[in-house]
Every structure is written in structure tokens, then in C-alpha cells.
């Protein structure tokens, strides 16, 4: 795809972790995530840093285009700086996480459901569940659950609902 874009004179911006990688070398522009070597099969670190990098790029693009004020941009950037602290808070709640893991370890199917942006999070969460725990998992758009998928939910199925957008509370 990258080479096809280059053949058609389409500028290519890559978001990569490895300096000097083949994608970086063939791209016109490169943003590096500097995540370091990936140890996990699930590539969680690479995925997370690429997502953050693209989010930051989008915020600056919005500011350049006049869609957001500089004060809004600065506020959003401050929230990103706080992410490591927020992740540390989640990890510090080890007892609660372990409780959930013990309670649901016997699930033979895990369904992640979400709407809008949360559906994308569900897709990645489902992939991580499969890659790390070897448990069958699927992601579904919350609005589609009633069209046949709901019949798959039975004893031994865990449903994880993801809702991060308050304006979708009523629909989800």
C-alpha cells in the first residue's frame, strides 16, 4: 500500500516505533513513537503509543485548521501528560483486578460491546483477550447485539461493555 501511494505521488506519513525501519525509509515523513522494543505478543506498547501519536497529530491539525483554540489544545496535551499517572492508578488496584480475573477466568467466550469510538476499543480489547489469554473473544457494535448475536450469550459467556462517551449512554 505504501509503495502504491508513492507510485501515485501521494505523500506518505508513517507512525513507527523503529528508527530506520523499512516503512520509515520509504515514507516521505515519519513520526516516531520511541516506545522501545516490544516484548509482548499483543504489541500493546506499540499500539498505545501509535494511538497517542496520531491523537496528538490530530489535535495539532485541528488547531492549525482553526477547529480548536490553543487553550483547548494545551488542556488536551496536559491530559496526555497525565496518562502514565492514570495507568499507574489502574495498576495499583491490583487486588480488584485480580478479583475480576479470578471471577471470570472460567469464561469460555468473551464479548466486548461498544458503540462509536468504543467499538474500536472493543475490537482491540477482544484481540488482546485472544492473544494473551487464548480465550475466544469477539467485538460487537452495541446496536447490533440484538440482531442474532444476543442468542450466543449463555452460561460461561462474559460480556464486557465499554462506554467512554457520555452522549451515548442512552443508546448503549
Model-derived features with residue positions:
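A SIS-like phosphosugar-recognition module
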Residues: 1-172
Amino acid at each position: 500500500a505504501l509503495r502504491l501511494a508513492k507510485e501515485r505521488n501521494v505523500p506518505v506519513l508513517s507512525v513507527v516505533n523503529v528508527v530506520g525501519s523499512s516503512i520509515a525509509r520509504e515514507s516521505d515523513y515519519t513520526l516516531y513513537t520511541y516506545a522501545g522494543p516490544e516484548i509482548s505478543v499483543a504489541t500493546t506498547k506499540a499500539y498505545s503509543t501509535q494511538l497517542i501519536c496520531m491523537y496528538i497529530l490530530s489535535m495539532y491539525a485541528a488547531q492549525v485548521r482553526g477547529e480548536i483554540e490553543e487553550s483547548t489544545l494545551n488542556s488536551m496535551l496536559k491530559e496526555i501528560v497525565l496518562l502514565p499517572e492514570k495507568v499507574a492508578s489502574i495498576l495499583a488496584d491490583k487486588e480488584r483486578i485480580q478479583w475480576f480475573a479470578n471471577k471470570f477466568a472460567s469464561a469460555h467466550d468473551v464479548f466486548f460491546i461498544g458503540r462509536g469510538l468504543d467499538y474500536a476499543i472493543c475490537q482491540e480489547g477482544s484481540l488482546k483477550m485472544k492473544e494473551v489469554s487464548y480465550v475466544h473473544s469477539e467485538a460487537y457494535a452495541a446496536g447490533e447485539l440484538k440482531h442474532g448475536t444476543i442468542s450466543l450469550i449463555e452460561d460461561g459467556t462474559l460480556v464486557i461493555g465499554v462506554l467512554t462517551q457520555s452522549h451515548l449512554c442512552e443508546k448503549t
